[in-house]
Amino acid sequence: METLNVSNVSLTYPGLYSDQAVIALKGVNLEIKSGDFVVALGASGCGKTTLLNLMAGFMAPSDGEIMLGDRRITGPGADRGVVFQKHALLPWLNVIDNTEFGLKLRGVDKATRRDLATRNLALVGLQDFHRHMIYHLSGGMQQRVGIARALTCDPAMLLMDEPMAALDALTRETIQELLLEVWQLTNKMFFFITHSVEEALFLGSRLIVMSPRPGRITHTYELDFNKRFLENGNARAIKSSRDFIDMREEILGIIYGDELQSGNPELLHA
């Protein structure tokens, strides 16, 4: 069973002058095991995406280290799949060619990569869209292709940076439910960033709340709303339950504090 360990990680962005350095993260510790669905919440600029980029190997910490199993993360790798807010698919390739693209780069033979891509497209409900071009798909379907592409390389971990931020509400709920089914079937590690408290509560088996810069993990919650959904399939009932609503209000209060008390309508519907 794989484990990702973030150990006392800090990141400082140097400024033009020494007094202009920006401390993005400070002393972050986090453990994620196979089967964990960890969701990160926090106000804009708190370092959520920076932490994900460090896990992905897109950048290196100023202090501390990140280990995946016994391997120190020093760059991107096939053991971590990334799904971005924008799908990052190749528009000149069709759905199945996009899905198997990572395996092709690794030199996997065509029959094997086609089989893996076919299975993962079926997993996200796109078994009938192999030959469709990316620009013919809706935003939700494009994100499904992105998820299938990440899964096809069989990573130990999926890193997802607000993958549903640009989707309409109905599509967003559909993809949320799909993600939980994928999580249940694959038992992979998930690290998911969102600005929606409702989405975080529904998806996560663990929720971390990060402070404004310098980003630190200030609160951790163990959750089971996702398992309740997988047992009964009624997302609306879960999201309207008293304990779900109470938890939502508590976390909104932590993140936004006085702003929430002022009645800002954007926050009240977060």
UniProtKB/Swiss-Prot annotation:
<comment type="similarity">
    <text>Belongs to the ABC transporter superfamily. Taurine importer (TC 3.A.1.17.1) family.</text>
</comment>
<dbReference type="GO" id="GO:0005524">
    <property type="term" value="F:ATP binding"/>
</dbReference>
<comment type="function">
    <text>Part of the ABC transporter complex TauABC involved in taurine import. Responsible for energy coupling to the transport system.</text>
</comment>
<keyword id="KW-1003">Cell membrane</keyword>
<dbReference type="InterPro" id="IPR027417">
    <property type="entry name" value="P-loop_NTPase"/>
</dbReference>
<dbReference type="InterPro" id="IPR017871">
    <property type="entry name" value="ABC_transporter-like_CS"/>
</dbReference>
<dbReference type="GO" id="GO:0016887">
    <property type="term" value="F:ATP hydrolysis activity"/>
</dbReference>
<feature type="binding site">
    <location>
        <begin position="42"/>
        <end position="49"/>
    </location>
    <ligand>
        <name>ATP</name>
    </ligand>
</feature>
<dbReference type="InterPro" id="IPR003439">
    <property type="entry name" value="ABC_transporter-like_ATP-bd"/>
</dbReference>
<dbReference type="Pfam" id="PF00005">
    <property type="entry name" value="ABC_tran"/>
</dbReference>
<dbReference type="GO" id="GO:0015411">
    <property type="term" value="F:ABC-type taurine transporter transporter activity"/>
</dbReference>
<keyword id="KW-0997">Cell inner membrane</keyword>
<keyword id="KW-0614">Plasmid</keyword>
<keyword id="KW-0813">Transport</keyword>
<keyword id="KW-0547">Nucleotide-binding</keyword>
<dbReference type="GO" id="GO:0005886">
    <property type="term" value="C:plasma membrane"/>
</dbReference>
<keyword id="KW-0472">Membrane</keyword>
<dbReference type="InterPro" id="IPR050166">
    <property type="entry name" value="ABC_transporter_ATP-bind"/>
</dbReference>
<feature type="domain" description="ABC transporter">
    <location>
        <begin position="4"/>
        <end position="237"/>
    </location>
</feature>
<keyword id="KW-1278">Translocase</keyword>
<keyword id="KW-0067">ATP-binding</keyword>
<comment type="subunit">
    <text>The complex is composed of two ATP-binding proteins (TauB), two transmembrane proteins (TauC) and a solute-binding protein (TauA).</text>
</comment>
<dbReference type="InterPro" id="IPR003593">
    <property type="entry name" value="AAA+_ATPase"/>
</dbReference>
<protein>
    <recommendedName>
        <fullName>Taurine import ATP-binding protein TauB</fullName>
        <ecNumber>7.6.2.7</ecNumber>
    </recommendedName>
</protein>
